[in-house]
Amino acid sequence: VVADMILKIGQPKLRVRTGDVGGGFGMKIFVHPEYPLVVWASRTLKRAVKWIPDRQEAFQSDVQGRDHVSLAEMALDKDSKFLGMRVTTHAALGAYLSHFGAFIPTMAGSGMLAGLYQTPTVYVNVKGIMTNTVPTDAYRGAGRPEAAYLLERFVDHIAREVGLSPDELRKRNLVKPNQIPWNTALGDTYDSGDFDTVMLKGMEKADWKGFAARKAQSAAKGKWRGIGMATYVEKCSGGAPESAIAKFNDDDTISVFVGVQTNGQGHETAFTQIMSARLGVDAERIRIVQGDSDVTPEGMTGGSRSIPVAGAAVLGLSDKIIEKGKLVAASAMEASAGDIEYKDAIFRIVGTDRTMSLFDVAKAAKDPKNLPAGETPGLDGDFTRTPQAATFPNGCHVCELEVDPDTGTVEILNYTIMDDFGTALNPLLLQGQVHGGVGQGIGQALTEKTIYDNDSGQLMSGSLMDYALPRADVVPSVKFDMHNSLCTTNPLGVKGAGEAGAIGAPPSVVNAIVNAIFEHTGVKHVDMPVTAASLWAVIEANRKRKAA
């Protein structure tokens, strides 16, 4: 866009290099007007130009997320099995339509309203509303948190109405392992999963059975203790193809060029692990290169797709190197390609001690005499992976908290997650991704809200003094574990993980709050964010009703 439409110089003449970006969570996907202006100014002035937006600018112009009002209805049979659900959603789109603005509440979010349940019929009607606000667009989860919040709050509400515990109603309606692959009422196919076990293990890890005793301890201190759960599923890892390119260097290292760009997820570590494990090459010999338009292929980070798609491309590239290497090794050692085996970076003639290392074969491949007809010199190559289907990470979040009835303050005491991410390439990276998502989900549940003056339309939350991000004392330590079922739609068996924490957190937190206050107030629902002020107002209104 910048090269062709604004500078009119053609893409080959514009080089873009990306350093450490930091989290974007959706907002940084787009071409903001300042980007081409900075390039134009730099070209005009013939000097470096740097643009730093201030926080107020960001609040006034960057896309924001969520902002739905929904009505849900559910039909159940006499055994409390779900028969059908109808949802009408009014989705605020902002003053003008952004890139994925209409896609998020419709195709991205609405498809997840089937959840992990066997509901045979689901009807969804989404109405987009233009509002005098900044546009809404992708924010970590992009439609899936909205769907999970609506569905899981609704399931808890239904359980209370029919006289069942939240876990019992879910157990009656969750898709069972013997029903996988499961075709949802909204057109998705869950290829793998053990949803019952994930929920039960999450409850066990959270010591769900011991909650009553802990609740009594809180009551003795004058606090109201609540516990809430939420299951979730996310459709992710689809979209455009991703490519990986390998270049063997003279110092016996491999440079791997990828199109995705890390913003703190640890792509470099994960891609290195994939190639190192497949080729048997020390991780120190693999260099991941990203963020340079002159040398890296096209790609996009987003939608929890980097490892399932780009990671699968790195895996395919590794296999391609091995297969070509066998041909070269066979020619160099005067053997049949079928007699060559590969293990731990060594090509060997089966049944002999005749070997060549991967890097020796890479050097030999530069000599045309070692190449079969039609093969290009070297082991350098590329591989493109086109996603065949989405992945469906899923899990169960359990939140336990205390409410101070005198102030409305909420303190999260315990937070437990049981996730299914398929193959866990690097559990530490996965845990970091989930922790970050939970922090953002807790922020949505308890503190974060963009406020405009109703009369003037003036933005009232234009700084971090007015817009309350969750602080370290709000986000608890998280007990995280996995019960994984291998994904069948990509060769790594992985499922996307980048957005999962932000999807499961909001409903589990609000379910816990309602659980804490219901027996004291009879209140069955509170809207997010459940700030201390708003919750105190609910409690105080109930006191006044009782006193009247």
Residues covered by each model-derived region:
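Conserved beta-alpha junction segments in alpha/beta enzyme cores
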Residues: 1-6, 226-260, 265
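Short acidic, glycine/serine/threonine-rich loops at helix termini
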Residues: 1-2, 25-31, 60-66, 86-88, ...
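A glycine- and small-aliphatic-rich helix-loop capping segment at beta-alpha/alpha-beta transitions
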Residues: 3-8, 30-41, 67, 241-243, ...
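C-terminal catalytic domains of large/alpha subunits in multi-subunit enzymes
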Residues: 8-15, 42-49, 78, 104-223, ...
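Thiamine diphosphate
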Residues: 24-46, 50-52, 267-275
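Active-site cavity-forming subdomains of large catalytic enzyme subunits
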Residues: 34, 48, 55-122
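Short, small/polar residue-rich loop motifs at catalytic or cofactor-binding pockets
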Residues: 68-70, 240-242, 395-397
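Short, solvent-exposed aromatic-acidic interface loops
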Residues: 87-96, 261-262, 415-422, 484
